[in-house]
Amino acid sequence: MIETLPLKAPDPLLKIIKMFREDPRTDKSDLGVGVYKDATGNTPVMRAVKDAEGVLLASQKTKTYVGQQGDVDFLKLVGQLAFGEMSREFVSIQAVGGTGALRLGCDLLRESGAKRILLPAPCWPNHPSIVRAARLEPIDVPFFNIAEQRIDMDALIGGFAKAERGDGIIIQACCHNPLGADFSIEQWKDIADALNARGIIAFVDLAYQGFGDGIDEDVAGARVLLERVPEAVIAVSEAKSFGIYRERVGALFVKAAEKARPAVMSNLAAIARANYSMPPDHGAAIVREVLSDEALRASWREELDQIRSHIKRTRRQLAAARVNSMPMHLIADQKGMFSTLPLNDAQVTALREQHGIYMTDSARINVAGLREADIPRFVEALKAVA
């Protein structure tokens, strides 16, 4: 019966957001939120997005369903943006955001016989929940030394022994959340070779294309992996790259042998039908309009370049700080919005209670959430607690 349902604990990040909003201090800083913020602390709508919406408002003739696969032109354009020419051989379906794409992919892997999903840890906190909801077993594979801020490839590849043939592994393509630590091209090759040797299916999570080094640069490693493995699943989110978080724009791509593609598509369609039936259109239509119009595409890329430059500039300023023995200099080499600092629970609590600086309990910070004027205060607060 419904009245017997247990009370679930709130999402830790939502708890932090609530605490920040209720904090009366005017000099507080929210470094926990997972969205991009500009130098003024706002998350603006991109100019190209606004212009595309104007085009859609004037030209759209109907609000009927776009079809179960979704907007095929959107899928083609997003596939080309992420994977280049190889995307023409991928099966694709529009999804309800990146999270929806991850769930679709996990359900597909379960249908194919997978029982476990390896998660290089620490991972995005929602990955394990999605995996469990798909009735798969999430298995952590430690791969990062937070104290030294470096990837441990031996630990990662050694952890592949925890999986069996046909199991999967979720690997973030770029701008790792929560670490900001990306693999080199050579490391991507090593990962691909190790996955092939064990028969593990790569599940690439691409959510921050353009936030690291550039549109093509951010997916260069993932493309290398996809060229070397026979099968793969790829979840794509356009929430961050286009600043359209609430529109829930995602897609799932599957690399499979040609003879298997009809079965892949039929299974994806069945999974989608039982979950949400038809995907939403507005956000995907925005992305399609931007990517298919030369002027809008140029405007979008220019603004994305500005976002990336802002993040890199903040990283350089943080890296120049001296905070006791903390290896702050390595923050400059990390990519995207997030980094995880070597802080314990007591230090995270002290930053929040004594200095009004909010971050997740794991000490993940959103670099883009730190305004330039607040950097000196943040550094001094770190010195006080570290």
Regions found by a protein language model. Name each.
Residues D30, L330-N344, H355-A373:
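Conserved PLP cofactor-binding pocket of PLP-dependent enzymes
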Residues M1-V66, Q80, A274, P280, ...:
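N-terminal "arm"/small-domain region of PLP-dependent enzymes with the aminotransferase-like
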